[in-house]
């Protein structure tokens, strides 16, 4: 059997007919998408090679772990500093989009909750910022569901996870 497909329908090619059907159902609800919550690159204006300070009033999450950083040195994303944040890696998981030995796809290589007074370098994105820890935990758990990982895998076709990678994922 053959099927007709409009290749420009979603802004990205969806390879699997079943996935196309699911995306149609999700988009038909016209709900807000997670892309409206995810930060752009460099959520705090800090490059990957930024190193922590000896002393500071903030905790910096960077590619080698955590360290101290001065609030006075942060000019971008200031409104996020005192919120609970869900942080994800800017790079997608390994295996070039292939399933692991258990047949599971790891789309997000790092997903962590950052407490208030924490920031990160451009190695990471802020997937969402919240007033309470409970909201951050709920969102963190949502990002780890098969539903979200599946929708992300359809559009995250490069090694980078971006705000646009969340264009199919509805806010819950």
Task: Locate the predicted segments by residue.
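C-terminal substrate-recognition regions of SAM-dependent nucleic acid methyltransferases
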Residues: 1-172
């Amino acid at each position: 059997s053959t099927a007709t497909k409009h290749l420009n329908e979603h802004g990205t090619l969806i390879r699997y007919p079943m996935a196309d059907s699911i995306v149609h159902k999700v988009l038909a609800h016209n709900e807000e998408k997670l892309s409206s919550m995810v930060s752009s690159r460099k959520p705090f204006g800090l490059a990957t090679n930024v190193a922590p300070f000896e002393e500071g009033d903030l905790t910096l999450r960077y590619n080698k772990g955590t360290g101290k950083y001065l609030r006075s040195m942060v000019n971008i994303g200031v409104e996020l500093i005192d919120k609970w944040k869900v942080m994800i890696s800017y790079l997608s998981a390994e295996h070039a989009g292939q399933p692991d030995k258990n047949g599971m796809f790891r789309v997000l290589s790092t997903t962590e909750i950052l407490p208030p007074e924490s920031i990160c370098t451009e190695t990471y994105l802020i997937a969402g910022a919240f007033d309470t820890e409970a909201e951050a935990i709920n969102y963190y758990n949502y990002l780890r569901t098969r539903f979200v990982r599946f929708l992300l895998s359809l559009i995250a076709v490069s090694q980078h996870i971006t705000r646009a990678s969340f264009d199919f994922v509805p806010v819950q």
